[in-house]
Amino acid sequence: MVLTKLDKIKDEWARLAGEYDRQTTRGLLTPRAAAFCKRTIRNLIGSDPKDVLDVGTGTGLLAVEIAKAGHRVVGVDLTPEMLERARARSTGEGVEVTWLEGDAMSLPCETGRFDVTVSRHVLWTMPDPAKAFTEWVRVTKPNGRVVWFDSTWVKRSSTGSLLAWARETALARALRSTLRQKPKEHCCHYDTSLEGALPFRDLTSVRPIVELLRNLGISDVVFKSAQGAAPWNGILERLRSRERYYSAWFTVTPELHARLVGKAAQ
């Protein structure tokens, strides 16, 4: 059987559901990141109860936090193994979230259903980001909002990389010797062919995203630094990280909604 790109993505995240859950929980539930998350939910979604879709919900951490803030939440993910953990999380937290299995580029949701559509670290996994944004607009109400969280990567010159490596290595050896910690690897390792099929993987700038959105007729987009969401637990991780976290959003005007809904139907 020949696996499609979507099959490969699904299989990879199914394999990594447990490790992803541990890393996400560990990172986003630090006091600094948790406070940032609550503040961001209040600022970007509001305090009045709303219908919110969490696309690529994973193990449901963001969806559950949004539900705890009083919103009506639906979480969609491609991977049953992720959703199994998401259901356990919402049950454990005592909040109601509707969990659906589905593709972020072809959502199992009706048109104009949600006041806000959110995603966290999902955009880079999309083989077709334009199709994904078109879908996210489709399921959002006119005058609603599309919000996403992601990161870019800092380029390093060869000299800068060498210095950073030397500094990190010396500090890492000292700390690991003291704390007996093992090096942490990134939880997701796609094969080379799949990585090459993801246009927004390892971006060093948001410019390609801005250009894509402009081509879709979306120009009034707000990007804001979200370093408060960085899942750092101490100086070692802070030194090692090259990620620069950001939040972004735009309003789905009635004109934009009508045009992209028509495009999605073609």
Language model segments and positions:
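A short glycine-rich, Lys/Arg-flanked "PGG" loop and its adjoining helix->strand segment in the class I
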Residues: 130-142
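Core SAM-dependent methyltransferase catalytic element
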Residues: 216, 234-266
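Short catalytic micro-motifs in class I SAM-dependent methyltransferases
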Residues: 121-122
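Short alpha-helix
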Residues: 199-217, 223
